[in-house]
């Protein structure tokens, strides 16, 4: 009886090993498939290089790249090291009609704002801003004085 029990145990172990090997083989194939897909995706995106960005996609990308600094659609005069370009060219010319990369996008970001103390902001607010003057519009006297009488035409 003990030999019969050993035989069934060995058969179970062998059957279990076969199932485990089959599952391992399937899992390896799935992992290999994922690895190949990842490789192809990365290779394709690396080969693509700079992209063209237009419209809302360009604005969203600039907001992401520049963050709280904000951005310009055209470079300020004298901004950047390449002065041979016309100052009329803007981000749309460079990134929508042609391809541009991250560094090109970053050139259109506004400079970082420097933190000011609360006192300097308060002082600046009172000294730098002129008082709003009321606009005085003269009365229209071209029709003449009609008094309280209403004229019909």
From Swiss-Prot:
- In residue numbers, the region (B) covers 49-77
Residues of the region (D) are 111-118
Q: Where is the composition biased (Polar residues)?
A: 139-153
Enumerate the Gene Ontology biological process terms.
cell population proliferation; head morphogenesis; insulin-like growth factor receptor signaling pathway; negative regulation of apoptotic process; negative regulation of release of cytochrome c from mitochondria; negative regulation of Wnt signaling pathway; positive regulation of cell population proliferation; positive regulation of phosphatidylinositol 3-kinase/protein kinase B signal transduction
Location in the cell: Secreted
According to the record, the residues making up region (A) are 90-110
Which GO MF terms does the UniProt record name?
growth factor activity; hormone activity; insulin-like growth factor receptor binding
Q: Which residues form the propeptide?
A: 119-153
UniProt feature coiled coil, ranges = none
| Composition bias type Basic and acidic residues, residue spans | 125-138
UniProt entry keywords in alphabetical sequence: Developmental protein, Disulfide bond, Growth factor, Secreted, Signal
Main subcellular localization, coarse class? secreted
Taxonomically, the superkingdom here is: Eukaryota
Cellular component GO terms, alphabetical? extracellular region; extracellular space
Does Disulfide bond show up as a keyword for this record?
Answer: yes
Q: Name one Pfam family in it.
A: Insulin
Q: Where is this region: Disordered?
A: 119-153
Q: In which tissues is it expressed?
A: Expressed in adult liver, lung, heart, kidney and peritoneal fat.
Region annotation (C) maps to 78-89
Q: Tell me the disulfide pairings in this chain.
A: 29-38, 54-96, 66-109, 100-109
Q: Which family does it belong to?
A: Belongs to the insulin family.
Biological role: The insulin-like growth factors, isolated from plasma, are structurally and functionally related to insulin but have a much higher growth-promoting activity. Promotes head development by inhibiting Wnt signaling during embryogenesis. Acts as a ligand for IGF1R. Binds to the alpha subunit of IGF1R, leading to the activation of the intrinsic tyrosine kinase activity which autophosphorylates tyrosine residues in the beta subunit thus initiatiating a cascade of down-stream signaling events leading to activation of the PI3K-AKT/PKB and the Ras-MAPK pathways. Binds to integrins.
How is this protein named in the record?
Insulin-like growth factor 1.S
What organism does the UniProt record list as the source?
Xenopus laevis
Q: What is the lineage of its organism?
A: Eukaryota, Metazoa, Chordata, Craniata, Vertebrata
